[in-house]
């Protein structure tokens, strides 16, 4: 289409998902336009460049094996990946003490805690295996699990306080919310569609294995450059009107665009900023009121030298202390060893609690906990500090992703990506693989673009959903479990076994005593 402001498809949102959709449409000979509310592309990815940091990812940054779509895009853009350092030991900080370790999860020396931890991960993966990626509301136990919070599930399956405490951190780290806030069905689905508990939490061979050299915003900027003037910045969408032959979209700056189809590539809750004519269907209208965003402040502390590596630590800290602002850290030093830095997340309840502090106060508290965990005075003397509070972002509403409270997924989940007339829905929340990550954003954007192409008669329906070949540069390795990890009983199972054993021994002893005449009938 050549008329001014008239296109084949309007894409709302210039993050990775929206740009992926527009890129694919353009490659297939269609005419898309991208309307982005901010003065930049990238959405929940945000790379800042300055003298102190060279560059720093204040938003989405991590990528790993099985995230093949975002890796393909990066390769097309000439963006290389670098491994997050995990050569030295990690540190688990609990009850005021630091415990160095190697591997994905901290080891447990208490046998009851070990059984409890092992059963927790095994149980979550077992439950997740029942949940269909494409339709979690169709799981055999969907209704039961959706009425339950993750806190209720943890209370049900965990016997020890240490397992419950770490399980809470596991939810905080992965979805920036609290166990009492999220549906068990939704969280179990979320972990499953990321490849399971090991894949989602691990650095090496997991979701945090790598970053993009030069920052993740390069990928959005590369796609935007390819689209050229089709990307309109500072164009928040105010109104979507489907009543005419063409869909009309109006922005806050009073620009009007027309197209045959529209792809909405924003977090679901941001649909509330748009006025729809005709009104959205009842379930879609209620869905967008019911899926809040997670809460996180991403913090990067810079130091004169990499003192933690000199002490034999890689920079990863798993911190279990209520007063500590940070729950998880990763090394953020540049691959050539320059600009030594530690990245940490202020998560969920702690994010909400510490939002009221000044930036300087947050930095001070972060440095203090790093000093205690690493046992180093040097941690108290940073040379620079960067942070990004995603809760204050008007056009994100939070990070990393939207979460589903109890009861929502089974009642409203089926309309999450269901088209409304000529409106189609993208955004990482609508993905079925690595939802919440950059990978999910690409899958969702390209799927929505293919839905439009199918509706236009350009592709068969069978081509809407497509698998992605594995990345050659970043292959996925299987996680190998030991015999004991597969067969170690839960605490409850062990207690039942002991009780049954004691009962059996007592019964056998009684029978023997009776046979020998040691017991007589009265």
Swiss-Prot record:
Q: Which reaction does it catalyse?
A: a secondary aliphatic amine + O2 + H2O = a primary amine + an aldehyde + H2O2
Required cofactor names: FAD
Question: Which keywords has UniProt assigned to this entry?
Answer: FAD, Flavoprotein, Membrane, Mitochondrion, Mitochondrion outer membrane, Oxidoreductase, Transmembrane, Transmembrane helix
**Per the UniProt record, which EC number(s) apply here?**
1.4.3.4
User: What's the main place this protein lives?
Assistant: mitochondrion
Q: Which InterPro entries match?
A: Amino_oxidase, FAD/NAD-bd_sf, Flavin_amine_oxidase, Flavin_MAO
- Which regions of this chain are Mitochondrial intermembrane-facing, per the record's topological domains? 514-522
Query: Cellular component terms, GO, for this chain's entry?
Result: mitochondrial outer membrane
User: Annotated site (Important for catalytic activity), which positions?
Assistant: 158, 367, 384
Q: Sorted alphabetically, which Pfam families does this protein's record hold? A: Amino_oxidase
Per the record, the domain of life is: Eukaryota
Q: What are the protein's GO molecular function terms?
A: flavin adenine dinucleotide binding; monoamine oxidase activity; primary methylamine oxidase activity
**On the Cytoplasmic side, which residues?**
1-492
**Localization per Swiss-Prot or TrEMBL:** Mitochondrion outer membrane
Transmembrane stretches in the record are 493-513
Describe the function of this protein: Catalyzes the oxidative deamination of biogenic and xenobiotic amines and has important functions in the metabolism of neuroactive and vasoactive amines in the central nervous system and peripheral tissues. Oxidizes both 5-hydroxytryptamine (5-HT) and beta-phenylethylamine (PEA).
Protein family (similarity comment): Belongs to the flavin monoamine oxidase family.
| Name of protein | Amine oxidase [flavin-containing]
Organism expressing this protein natively: Oncorhynchus mykiss (Rainbow trout)
**Lineage start:** Eukaryota, Metazoa, Chordata, Craniata, Vertebrata
């Amino acid at each position: 289409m050549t008329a001014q402001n008239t296109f084949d498809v309007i894409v709302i949102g210039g993050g990775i998902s929206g740009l992926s959709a527009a890129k694919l449409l353009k490659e297939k000979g269609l005419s898309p336009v991208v309307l982005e509310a901010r003065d930049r592309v990238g959405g929940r990815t945000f790379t800042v460049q300055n003298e102190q940091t060279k560059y720093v990812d204040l938003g989405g940054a991590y990528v790993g094996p099985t995230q093949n779509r975002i890796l393909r895009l990066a390769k097309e853009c000439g963006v290389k990946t670098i491994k997050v350092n995990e050569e030295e030991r990690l540190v688990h900080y609990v009850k005021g003490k630091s415990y160095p370790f190697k591997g994905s999860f901290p080891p447990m020396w208490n046998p009851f805690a070990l059984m409890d931890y092992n059963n927790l991960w095994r149980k979550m993966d077992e439950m997740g295996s029942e949940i269909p990626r494409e339709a979690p509301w169709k799981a055999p136990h969907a209704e039961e699990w959706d009425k339950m919070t993750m806190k209720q599930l943890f209370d049900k399956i965990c016997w020890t306080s240490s397992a419950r405490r770490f399980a809470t951190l596991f939810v905080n780290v992965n979805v920036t919310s609290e166990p009492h806030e999220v549906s068990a069905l939704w969280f179990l689905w979320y972990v499953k569609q990321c490849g399971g508990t090991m894949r989602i939490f691990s650095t090496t061979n997991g979701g945090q294995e790598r970053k993009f050299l030069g920052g993740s915003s390069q990928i959005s900027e590369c796609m935007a450059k390819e689209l050229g003037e089709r990307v309109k910045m500072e164009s928040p969408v105010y109104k979507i009107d489907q009543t005419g032959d063409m869909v009309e979209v109006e922005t806050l700056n009073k620009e009007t665009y027309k197209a045959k189809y529209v792809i909405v590539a924003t977090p679901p809750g941001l649909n509330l900023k748009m006025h729809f004519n005709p009104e959205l269907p009842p379930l879609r209208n209620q869905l967008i009121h019911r899926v809040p965003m997670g809460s996180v402040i991403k913090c990067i502390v810079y130091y004169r030298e990499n003192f933690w590596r000199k002490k034999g630590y890689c920079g990863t800290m798993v911190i279990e202390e209520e007063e500590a602002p940070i729950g998880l850290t990763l090394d953020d030093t540049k691959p050539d060893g320059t600009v030594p830095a530690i990245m940490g997340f202020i998560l969920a309840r702690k994010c909400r609690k510490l939002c009221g502090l000044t930036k300087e106060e947050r930095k001070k508290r972060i440095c203090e906990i790093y000093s205690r965990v690493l046992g180093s005075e040097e941690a108290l003397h940073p040379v620079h500090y960067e942070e990004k509070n995603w809760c204050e972002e008007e056009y994100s509403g939070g990070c990393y992703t939207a979460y589903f409270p109890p009861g929502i997924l089974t009642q409203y989940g089926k309309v999450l990506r269901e088209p409304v007339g000529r409106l189609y829905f993208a955004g990482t929340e609508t993905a079925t693989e690595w939802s919440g990550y950059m990978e999910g954003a690409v899958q969702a954007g390209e799927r929505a673009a293919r839905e439009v192409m199918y509706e236009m008669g350009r592709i068969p329906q069978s081509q809407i959903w497509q698998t992605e070949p594995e990345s050659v540069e970043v292959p996925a390795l299987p996680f190998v479990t030991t015999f004991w990890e597969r067969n170690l009983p839960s605490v409850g199972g062990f207690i039942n076994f002991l009780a049954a054993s004691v009962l059996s021994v007592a019964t056998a002893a009684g029978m023997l005593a009776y046979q020998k005449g040691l017991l007589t009938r009265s």
